[in-house]
Amino acid sequence: MANIDWYFDFLSPFAYFQFQRLRELQAHGEVSLKPVLFAGLLKHWEHKGPAEIPRKRRFTNRYALWFAPQNGIKFKLPPGHPFPLLAPLRLAHAAGNSYAAVAENFDYVWCEGGTPSDIEGFKARCHRLGIDDPVAALAAGDAFDASADAPGR
């Protein structure tokens, strides 16, 4: 069996779509979830993200709204895109990048259409993951932040 590293960011609806089929890879090996800070990659390569380019953002949104129902995936655009990513990244990190934590973040953003930086939504996600102290969950992500700017970490 192979070890499979899946690198993703919560900002991308395409990562959300891939995540919906990720369990299929588990038949071929152990899947390690590796969240990345997309902004760090863009900064490193001196490039704009697709959501920062109006035509690309419109195309991506239209395509995602078409793709999801074609593939039986529940999908709802969040109110603003791009959006701040640190809260979902820190929550995933605090929960050991578990499948449940990654699913909770993806579902909140792309299935429920939630705003990732909303504190009440963050507290609710912490509660559903059994994390009693949301402030500690945010602080636990400091280690993630320290390595997030390093491409290829």
Positions of the model-derived regions?
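C-terminal cap of thioredoxin/glutaredoxin-like
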Residues: N3-I4, L11, A15-S32, N97-A100, ...
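Structural alpha/beta surface segment adjacent to cysteine/selenocysteine redox centers
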Residues: F10, F14-E112
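Generic hydrophobic-segment detector
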Residues: A2-D5, R62
